[in-house]
Swiss-Prot record:
Subcellular location: Cytoplasm, Nucleoid
Matching Pfam families: NA37 (PF04245)
Source organism of the structure: Citrobacter koseri (strain ATCC BAA-895 / CDC 4225-83 / SGSC4696)
Record GO cellular component, one term: cytoplasm
Family label: Belongs to the YejK family.
Keyword Transcription among UniProt keywords: no
Main location: cytoplasm
InterPro entries, sorted: Nucleoid_associated_NdpA (IPR007358)
Lineage: Bacteria, Pseudomonadati, Pseudomonadota, Gammaproteobacteria, Enterobacterales
Keyword Cytoplasm: yes
Descriptive protein name: Nucleoid-associated protein CKO_00588
C-alpha cells in the first residue's frame, strides 16, 4: 500500500464521570515508524471499505479556518491537533455516548491524494501469550470497530472548493447522533447523497430497459451487467463512472445510457460512490417485518416466486431443502 504519513498526533479523552471528559495532550508528534504506518494503513483500509456520509465545510467552520491556517504554514500541526481535540471534547461531551478514547489526527498521502483523518479509537484490554507461553494483559486499538471517524480530502478541498464530497464521516453505532456530532465538530453541512445517487441510478436503469422494450430476461441481464460493474468498482475502492457504465451497456439501445440519463433529467453526477445496500436491489428482492424476513434472487420472480398485488400474496413454489426439513419435522410433531 502506497501510503506516506506527513504528520500524525495522538491525544486522549478520559471519561472520569458522567459530566467530565479529561483531556490528555501529547507534547510532540508521533514518529512515522513502521508500526505507526501499518496502523494508519489498516485504519485507511477499514475506513475506505465502509459506507460513509458526505459533507462540506460551512463558511463559519472553525475547524476549516484553523486547518487552512495550518496548511498555509501559520500554525504547526501539533498545535492544530491540540486545539481541535479541545473542541472535539466540548462537542462530544454534549452526547450520552461520549466514552472518551484515543484521538488521532493524521495527515497522510495515498495514491497522490492528501488526506486529514480524524478518529476517536477505543483502547481495549485483552490477553496475549508471550515467548514463555505465559498469559499477560495487553491493550490494543479497536480499529475494526471504529465508528467515530472523519476524513477530509485535502487535495479535493483545495483544488475544487465547490465540491460537495471532500469531507466524509461514518454514521456510527448510534445512527444519526454520531452524524450530528461530526457535523457540529467539523462545522459541516450535508453534501453529496450517495444513497440517493445510487437509487437514481437504479431507477434510470429500469427506465432505460423499459424504453428499449427489452423482455424480462434481457432486462435482468442488463441489471446484472450494471451490478457486476458497480460491484467491481466498489471492491476496488473506485467510484461509479457514468461514462464507463454507459460503455458497458453500449449494445442495449441506440441511445447511450449516459445520453439517456442526461436527456431524462436524472441529475446523476458524472461519478459517485457505490452504495452496497442499494445496489443489491439490482439482483435481489429483500424485506423484513412482522417476524418475517424474505430474500431471493430477482430472476426467480415470475418463475418460482409469484406476487399477486391485488391480495398482496407471495407464492413460493419449491422451498429450500433446509427450510423444508424444518417444516416437515415441526408439522410431524418432531423437534
Amino acid at each position: 500500500m502506497s501510503l506516506d504519513i506527513n504528520q500524525i498526533a495522538l491525544h486522549q479523552l478520559i471519561k472520569r464521570d458522567e459530566q467530565n471528559l479529561e483531556l490528555v495532550l501529547r507534547d510532540s508528534l508521533l514518529e512515522p515508524t513502521t508500526t505507526v504506518v501499518d496502523m494508519v494503513a489498516e485504519l485507511h483500509r477499514v475506513y475506505s471499505a465502509k459506507n460513509k456520509a458526505y459533507g462540506l465545510f460551512s463558511e463559519e467552520s472553525e475547524l476549516a479556518q484553523t486547518l487552512r491556517l495550518q496548511r498555509q504554514g501559520e500554525e504547526d500541526f501539533l498545535a492544530f491537533s491540540r486545539a481541535a481535540t479541545g473542541r472535539l471534547r466540548d462537542e462530544l461531551a454534549k452526547y450520552p455516548f461520549a466514552d472518551g478514547g484515543i484521538v488521532l489526527f493524521c495527515h497522510y498521502r495515498y495514491l497522490a491524494v492528501e488526506y486529514l483523518l480524524v478518529a476517536v479509537l477505543n483502547n481495549l484490554s485483552s490477553m496475549r501469550v508471550n515467548e514463555n507461553l505465559d498469559i499477560n494483559p495487553t491493550h490494543y486499538l479497536d480499529i475494526n470497530h471504529a465508528d467515530i471517524v472523519a476524513r477530509i480530502d485535502l487535495t479535493e478541498w483545495e483544488t475544487n472548493p465547490e465540491s460537495t464530497r471532500y469531507l466524509t464521516f461514518l454514521k456510527g453505532r448510534v445512527g444519526r447522533k454520531v452524524a450530528d456530532f461530526f457535523m457540529d465538530f467539523l462545522g459541516a453541512s450535508e453534501g453529496l447523497n450517495a444513497k440517493a445517487q445510487n437509487r437514481g441510478l437504479l431507477q434510470a436503469v429500469d427506465d432505460f430497459t423499459a424504453e428499449a422494450q427489452l423482455d424480462k430476461a434481457e432486462r435482468q441481464n442488463v441489471r446484472q451487467q450494471v451490478y457486476s460493474y458497480c460491484n467491481e468498482q466498489l471492491q476496488s475502492g473506485e467510484e461509479i463512472e457514468l461514462e464507463s457504465l454507459s460503455k458497458e451497456l453500449s449494445g442495449v439501445s441506440e441511445v447511450s445510457f449516459r445520453e439517456f440519463t442526461a436527456d431524462k433529467g436524472y441529475e446523476l453526477e458524472e461519478s459517485f460512490p457505490a452504495d452496497r445496500s442499494t445496489l443489491r436491489q439490482l439482483t435481489k428482492y429483500a424485506g423484513s417485518g412482522g417476524g418475517l424476513t424474505i430474500n431471493f434472487d430477482a430472476m426467480l420472480l415470475g418463475e418460482r416466486i409469484f406476487w399477486d398485488p391485488a391480495t398482496d400474496t407471495l407464492t413460493i413454489k419449491g422451498t429450500p431443502p433446509n427450510l423444508r426439513d424444518q417444516l416437515q419435522r415441526r408439522t410431524s410433531g418432531g423437534n
